[in-house]
């Protein structure tokens, strides 16, 4: 099994690569690419960790050598948020980066499962889809926006509030991956109940958690360690599904039946070809229904921005 990480010298990329070196199945190959010349050194550094995962590092303009025959590609390349920016401010730089990388994915590993981490995910996934479509290799079941950070944050915050174990707390999060488009389904969390005030406060905190980290880092970056953890969890779920494990379920931002928007984060069952089954979002509370209806215009605009970036 070959996993490629694009943007591997960045804060998220290095955290992700460290976790994958430690957690990928024995015999896997971890292929690291970044435009930064330090990347082969990151690979050398990781290669000293005693696990049966081979690591190779590639730098420079062309990611092709890193991508050749990859089974899974995780893309974290791009600029990070600074205080005062929201994820959509990143669009101007990151849109072009994602386009260029996905063009190379289409050429070198068109059947790979692709996880997009680069923000703004609501838009960059649409960009990736349109690039793959133009190349004649788009399969909607193989392209994912990694929204797992919203899930792990929701699990953590709910567990903290209710005195539960965060590792056994499971909060589904649907919609998108920025601001109001992030919708935690708190009404579906087993074994806990919330007041209306708690729901409003928790929802807001989960939606704004990225900003909380950006501000706490005081200009020194955005969420890299928790995002690395989230991306590793999602990447390892893809690998488990590729290896034939049954009932691997994750929430992810993907092109489904289009009921709410062309791309929408929802629970899916993963399999050898990517999405095996789109799972229902279940019963929503009145607050959740209202929040869902209220965010769809924002989400759809984000998607159109990505489509038009490629098709204009």
From Swiss-Prot:
EC id: 1.1.1.37
Keywords from the named record: NAD, Oxidoreductase, Tricarboxylic acid cycle
Active site: 177 (proton acceptor)
Metal-binding recorded as keyword: no
Residues annotated for NAD(+) binding in this entry: 7-13, 34, 94, 117-119, 227
Described purpose of this protein according to its UniProt entry: Catalyzes the reversible oxidation of malate to oxaloacetate.
Gene Ontology BP annotations: malate metabolic process; tricarboxylic acid cycle
Binding site for substrate: 81, 87, 119, 153
Protein name per UniProt: Malate dehydrogenase
Family membership noted in the UniProt record: Belongs to the LDH/MDH superfamily. MDH type 1 family.
GO CC, alphabetical: cytoplasm
Species per Swiss-Prot/TrEMBL record: Proteus mirabilis (strain HI4320)
Pfam families tied to this protein: Ldh_1_C, Ldh_1_N
Catalytic activities: (S)-malate + NAD(+) = oxaloacetate + NADH + H(+)
GO molecular function list: L-malate dehydrogenase (NAD+) activity
Subunit (UniProt): Homodimer.
């Amino acid at each position: 099994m070959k996993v490629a990480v694009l943007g591997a010298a960045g804060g998220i990329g290095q955290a992700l690569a460290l976790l994958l070196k430690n957690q990928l199945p024995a015999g896997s190959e971890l292929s690291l690419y970044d435009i930064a010349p330090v990347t082969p050194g990151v690979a050398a550094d990781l290669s000293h960790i005693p696990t049966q995962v081979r690591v190779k590092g590639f730098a420079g303009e062309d990611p092709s050598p890193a991508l050749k025959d990859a089974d899974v590609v995780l893309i974290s390349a791009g600029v990070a948020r600074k205080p005062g920016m929201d994820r959509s401010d990143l669009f101007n730089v990151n849109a072009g980066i994602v386009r260029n990388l996905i063009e190379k994915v289409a050429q070198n590993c068109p059947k790979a499962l692709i996880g997009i981490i680069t923000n703004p995910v609501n838009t960059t996934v649409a960009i990736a889809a349109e690039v793959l479509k133009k190349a004649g290799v788009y399969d909607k079941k193989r392209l994912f926006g990694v929204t797992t950070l919203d899930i792990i944050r929701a699990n953590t915050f709910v567990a903290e509030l209710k005195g539960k174990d965060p590792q056994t707390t499971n909060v589904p999060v649907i919609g998108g991956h920025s601001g109001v488009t992030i919708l935690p389904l708190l009404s579906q969390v087993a074994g806990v109940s919330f007041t209306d005030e708690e729901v409003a406060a928790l929802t807001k905190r989960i939606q704004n958690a990225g900003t909380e980290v950006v501000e706490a880092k005081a200009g020194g970056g955005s969420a890299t360690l928790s995002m690395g953890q989230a991306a590793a969890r999602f990447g390892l779920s893809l690998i488990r599904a590729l290896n034939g494990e049954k009932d691997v379920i994750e929430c992810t931002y993907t092109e489904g039946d289009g009921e709410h928007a062309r791309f929408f984060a929802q629970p899916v069952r993963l399999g050898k070809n990517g999405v095996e089954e789109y799972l229902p979002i279940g019963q929503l509370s009145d607050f959740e229904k209202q929040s869902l209806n209220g965010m769809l215009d924002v989400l759809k605009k984000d998607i159109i921005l990505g489509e038009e970036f490629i098709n204009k």
